[in-house]
């Protein structure tokens, strides 16, 4: 009686099938791990960015306007349009005057004073100074008094990085809630230089770098209504 067994061809086919299954399993596992790692990185970035952008929203809601309506030019809100905000070179610059600890923290010496804030996006300066959303804060009255002790090329106040991995910033403002386009949507303005008024609404679009090179930046949108808009339109006399 002949003993049953595997032929050489059957063994080779079995080994080939096992090899294919091993390779496919390894590829699937690698893809899952890579996707998980990228999602963790992106979630971490989004959480950090969400906190920083929340600070900006709080800072805009804390915009300062004198009750008498006598607004100095150097305290007014200013929006400089540099493009669509797709990259640092085309990103806008926003300045305004505020009260409170938003953006600067409650330990800052400026937290209890009226101070000015500027935000913009910048590329990486060096290994120690990464690119992202930057801010500068200062008090005009205090810095003007200390101007003689400062180099003429040195900007006033303190500069710091708010959040990394922001590669673009676009900002538009709505002057009045009644202003709308033909479709009834808010009419947005790309620039703002009216120092004696505050816009009714500000729309901020930040673009976050994704973990995968070559992917389009992920936009984060914030729309803020400024409480003191009505006071800037109807100052108390």
For each predicted feature, which ranges?
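Short, solvent-exposed loop/helix junctions and linker helices
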Residues: 2, 46, 50, 156, ...
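N-terminal single-pass transmembrane signal-anchor helix
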Residues: 2-29
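Sequence-level motif detector for i,i+2 pairs with an aromatic at +2
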Residues: 89-91, 157, 199
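Short linear sequence signals and composition-biased patches located at protein termini or domain-edge surfaces
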Residues: 160-237
